C-alpha cells in the first residue's frame, strides 16, 4: 500500500506493486502480456515459448513435489534420502537438457533456439567439444550472438587452463619494471610458485 487518499467522502487506496519481470521475444505483431502469467502470447514465438514454459513449470512442480516427499519420508535414512534426491536431480536435469536440445533442433536460428543454446552452454559439465557440437546445430545468427560467443570463449579459457595442460604464457613486469614472462621461470627443472597480487 503506497497511500490512502480521502476525497469527497470516498477512501481511495493506491497500491503500487514492487516490480514486474516479464520477458518476451520482440517480434512483429501484437504481443499480449498477462502479468499474472509467466510469459507472453499473441505472436508465434512468444506463444510457443509460453506453452513450453507451462510444460516446464508443470515438470518443475512435479519434481519439487517428489523432492518434498523424499525429504519428509521418515522411513528413509539420511543416506537413502541423499541418493534418492541425487537421482531425482539427475532425472530433472536430463529432462531439462533433452527439452533444450529439442528446442535448439526445432529452432536453430531464432530466439527460442537462442534461449535453448544459452541453457545448454550454461549447464554443469559442458565441455568445449560438446559446445562446438551444439554450435554445429545452431544457425549462423545464434553462433554470432555476443552472449553465445562469450560463453564459448569462456569454455575455451577453461579448457586451456585445465590441470595437467600446458600453461598459458603471459607477460607482466617485476618490481624493477622489467618485463617478465611466466615461461622465464616454468620448465627450468624446479618448482615454481607464482603469486598473483592485484592492487
Model-predicted regions and their roles:
Residues 76-86, 124, 162-169, 197-199:
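A short, terminal or domain-edge coil/loop segment
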Residues 31-33, 179, 189:
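A broad, structure-centric signal for solvent-exposed, well-ordered loop/edge residues
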Residues 181-199:
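Short active-site neighborhood of thiol/selenol oxidoreductases, capturing the structured segment around
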Residues 149-187:
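N-terminal "domain-start" segment that seeds a small globular fold
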Residues 1-98:
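A non-transmembrane, solvent-exposed segment enriched in polar/low-complexity residues
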Residues 116, 170, 194:
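Conserved hydrophobic/aromatic pocket- or pore-lining residues that grip, position, or stack substrates
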Residues 11-21, 31-32, 42-46, 82, ...:
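N-terminal targeting signals for export/organelle localization
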